[in-house]
Amino acid sequence: MTARQWELFCAFKDEFKSKIAQWHKKLERANILQELKDLQRQTADKDGVPFYELSEPFVYNNSLDDVVPTDDIKLIVIGDNPGKKEQLAENRRYLVGQSGVIAENFFKRNPELGIDFRKNVIILNKTPIHTAKTKELSVLMKQSPLLKELIIESQLWFARATAKLHCDLIENSDGEKSIGVWLVGYAELKGRGLFIPYRDELLKLYEGHDAWESVFVYQHFSMNRFLIDLGKNSSIYKTLSENLQQLGIRHRQAIFCK
């Protein structure tokens, strides 16, 4: 990273940590932090999720603290929300479960992309609030007005902070390389989905900015949906990069109508 990129990245990271602490305190003051944990457990049990240790209701991505000034950031990948493995005390990192393994192996198998998933990628989410399954966020929102407010507020913050970080990194690069954004998982970005606030805010923030052309939308890595979709929509007459770009733009236009 350039010196200015590093400065801006650190500012983003510090604000992220501050927001996690702020949201945590907000629930503590309202005396519903334990209620959130109970709801997270209950919704997982109701969905038949095998028992797992519930450690952290809000998850900051500790992988961000592993980034050093000499790292070459080439991509920002945005998932949905932290799952079972991501929230464990020994992890507190995004995309470390099966989906993360699939993503990591995809880049390892395709060195022509020039991306090390654990070294060249900043991984974020649409909200830092944990659930075993993304759809369970809707249950939390129905059970508590404050949780609903917090889930929406966190989406808006993530959209703003991510768009700003992306644009800042591009504007302060050495001009040699582009930095892309991959939105992986778009089911809840459609219709009356959970992440409509995120979608609409993100589109508004990129309005008139050239960085929008490097935002791509894909199926989620989970259950190999990303790989299956890419395989079905790839041409043998195009490079992998060309196929990825074409597919990512197609999904972006379908979701954002732009």
Language model segments and positions:
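Flexible, glycine- and charge-enriched loops at secondary-structure boundaries
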Residues: 92-100, 148-155
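A structural signal for short, well-ordered beta-strand segments and their strand-loop junctions
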Residues: 77, 115-116, 120-125, 180-185, ...
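Short secondary-structure capping micro-motifs at structural edges
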Residues: 61-64, 90-91, 104-113, 165-166
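Active-site and ligand/interface coordination hotspots across diverse enzymes
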Residues: 1-98, 174, 235, 242, ...
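Residue-level preference for short coil/turn positions at secondary-structure junctions
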Residues: 70-71, 117, 177, 211
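Short, surface-exposed acidic-centric catalytic microdomains
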Residues: 102-142
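Glycine/proline-rich loop-helix segments at beta-alpha junctions forming the active-site rim
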Residues: 3-4, 8, 131-258
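Conserved alpha-helical elements of sugar-nucleotide-dependent glycosyltransferases
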Residues: 95-106, 198
